[in-house]
Amino acid sequence: MTTLQTQPLNTLWYTRCPVPTGLGISIQKGWLKEKFNEQQIEIKSIRESNSKDIRNSHFNHTLANSVRHGGSIPAIWAYASGQKTKVIGLSWADEVQLLLTRYDSNIKTVADLKGKRFGIPLNQDAIIDFSRAQAIRGLENALKTVNLTVSDLELVDCLRADILAAQQQQPEENDSSFYGNRNKINASAEIVALIKGDVDAIFLKGAHAAQIAHDFALHTIIDIGSHPDPILRSNNGTPRTLTVDEDFLTQYPEQAQSIVDAVLQAEQWAHAHADETHRYLAKECNSSEQWVHAAYGADAHLKLNTNFDEISIIALQDLSDFLYRWNFIPAEINVREWLAQDIFIQAQVA
């Protein structure tokens, strides 16, 4: 790889989604900071920044010298929109992906959904409405198991006008924050619609889904996240992408390798420390160990694996094709051209 480094790297920006990732464990353990401090490089959190533009880089990856580990839909959208990024690893941690209805509903199977109202979140101010995309993806995948299509149902946009009004009163610095006041008043509109009876079924995934299904005694029509076909399980979190901006990779390949090293170190540690890892994952997911266990299984610590498995690449392409077909991204992409496997291979050898 040709190195075009012109000046020393002073700061690495990082971000990860509130889901199980090796990067998240590495950050909590202090290993990412340690590796970069040894090189006199400061690390800073994108999600904890006071700047809205910097926080938004979690979704659009516009910030130079940054790494992101999380849901693939925003990463795909950024790349398809022209942002020059590279994937330096893929991780796959299967999670519950639930189609849910009320306990008193007569909908018991996926086939029963034909002709019914399916609630889909609509986030008008989102840079990329990944919640909407993953809901349609989960629904479409589930319907394939009974030879139905999304057109066999009525999609109902779910939008909370009262939440939007409250959000507009929030200070600008809290806009798009992950842990600020905006988050406290933000409830999933599709959940409210289901409880009120305005829709017949919805899609939720992860620890949040497990808890909501329990707390409201919802009936699980199907957990498509446990289907034997990995393509039908593929969604925003399966696989997740570890991405950096392309200029960073070109100019600072040793630092990019340090990121991969830190992620792999965290995952190897997790495999041998189940209880501690589950506690860390609960923090990462903004949840409890109970719901992490319900969503990801007792072997959640063993599901932290970053690599370039062929099935992950195929699933990522399938997800990208879905996003283009549903107009979530502006252009088709070839995911193999997006991958930077050489850095990952070098890290494994080292």
Short names for language-model regions:
Residues 1-10, 350:
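Short, low-complexity disordered leader/linker segments with a strong preference
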Residues 7-151, 155-158:
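Short, glycine-/small- and polar/acidic-enriched structural segments
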Residues 33-37, 228-233, 303-311:
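Short, solvent-exposed loop/beta-turn-alpha elements that line the ligand-binding surface or hinge
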Residues 38-46, 147-155, 285-297, 330-336:
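Short, surface-exposed acidic
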Residues 73, 164-280:
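Pocket-lining segment of extracytoplasmic ligand-binding domains
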Residues 250-328:
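Secondary-structure end/capping motifs
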Residues 321-350:
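Conserved C-terminal helix/tail region of periplasmic/extracytoplasmic solute-binding proteins
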